[in-house]
Amino acid sequence: MERPQNRGNDQMRTVRIIPGFQKYPDGSVLIEAGDTRVMCSAMMEEKVPPFLRGKGSGWVTAEYSLLPSSTETRTQREASKGKISGRTSEIQRLIGRSLRAVVDMPAMGERTLWIDCDVLQADGGTRTAAITGSFVALYLAFKKFKEQGIIETIPVKDFVAAISVGIIDGTPILDLEYIEDSQADVDMNVVMTGNGDFIEIQGTAEGTVFSRAELDQLLELAGKGIQELIALQKTILGV
């Protein structure tokens, strides 16, 4: 099959991570994956949720939103609806889980790190881009806190990144754009650590089924892409 921009089946879109994109957050980036653009920021709050009070542990949580003009037809702000959608809630939880898996939260002290992900332009893979970019914003924030003497060490146990994979017309492909995602027989989001361990696998078939062999192919593709993303994260962070 021929892909947009004549990408190979195992080739990601061009990814850029621009650190320090905002003035006020403790850490921020703009991540671009092809035409998808997500602004990720990290800000510290000197308290934790009630269930963690007095336990000497920190917390990492995330919020996610689509700007109205990020999509081809205007997306209504969820604030004007009075509640967030199930999709938004799912993505927020996914981002938070992915980051907490690699953070030593007792080393944070009783503080909450808020991650905000705002999609400026959506062309597929916004949740995976949000995870990949948010990790860099989180690391930058922790680095700042260590330099300021707020924490003793950078409480990060491993790197984390995410990518989409799918099957179209029987062909496994890496990093789906929206036009590909909308016609995929199988669509999957994969979150992995730098050590190659899995944090989350979200995969579904539409109107068909997929085999164990195809699942293994997809996970192999995802692992390749995620290692490339983590190499980029390390370059940006200078580690």
Swiss-Prot record:
Which reactions is this enzyme annotated as catalysing? tRNA(n+1) + phosphate = tRNA(n) + a ribonucleoside 5'-diphosphate
Q: Which UniProt keywords apply?
A: Nucleotidyltransferase, RNA-binding, rRNA processing, Transferase, tRNA processing, tRNA-binding
What the entry lists under PROSITE patterns is as follows:
RIBONUCLEASE_PH (PS01277)
UniProt entry tagged with the keyword Signal? no
* Enzyme class, broadest EC rank: transferase
Q: Look up the EC number in the record and give it.
A: 2.7.7.56
Q: Give any single GO term for biological process.
A: rRNA catabolic process
Q: Which HAMAP family match?
A: RNase_PH
What is the role of the protein in this entry?
Phosphorolytic 3'-5' exoribonuclease that plays an important role in tRNA 3'-end maturation. Removes nucleotide residues following the 3'-CCA terminus of tRNAs; can also add nucleotides to the ends of RNA molecules by using nucleoside diphosphates as substrates, but this may not be physiologically important. Probably plays a role in initiation of 16S rRNA degradation (leading to ribosome degradation) during starvation.
Quaternary structure annotation from Swiss-Prot or TrEMBL: Homohexameric ring arranged as a trimer of dimers.
The UniProt family comment states: Belongs to the RNase PH family.
Record's protein name? Ribonuclease PH
Look up and give the organism this protein is from. Syntrophomonas wolfei subsp. wolfei (strain DSM 2245B / Goettingen)
